């Protein structure tokens, strides 16, 4: 469980860093699109983690 928590924190930190890296975001882009795509891929990612 501790490993899953650390992976989750790593994903959150990576997402925040990537979303703040762009100084001028595209005004036409949906700001939640990246986050929602990560949430949709999360079960697929968790299924491929070792130790399950």
Curated annotation (Swiss-Prot):
The keyword Ion transport does not apply. The modification Proline amide is found at residue 50. Residues 1-21 form the signal peptide. One of its GO terms (cellular component) is membrane. It is found in: Secreted; Target cell membrane. One of its GO terms (molecular function) is toxin activity. Transmembrane segments: none annotated. Residues 22-33 form a propeptide. Expressed by the venom gland. Its main location: secreted. Keywords: Amidation, Membrane, Secreted, Signal, Target cell membrane, Target membrane, Toxin. The keyword Signal applies. Cytotoxin that provokes cell lysis. Induces leak currents in cell membranes in the same way as melittin, suggesting a membrane disrupting mode of action. Also activates DRG neurons. DRG activation and cell lysis is potentiated by phospholipase A2 (PA2). In vivo, intraplantar injection in mice causes spontaneous pain behaviors and paw swelling, which are also potentiated by PA2 coinjection. This is Xylotoxin(1)-Xa1a. The lineage of its organism: Eukaryota, Metazoa, Ecdysozoa, Arthropoda, Hexapoda.
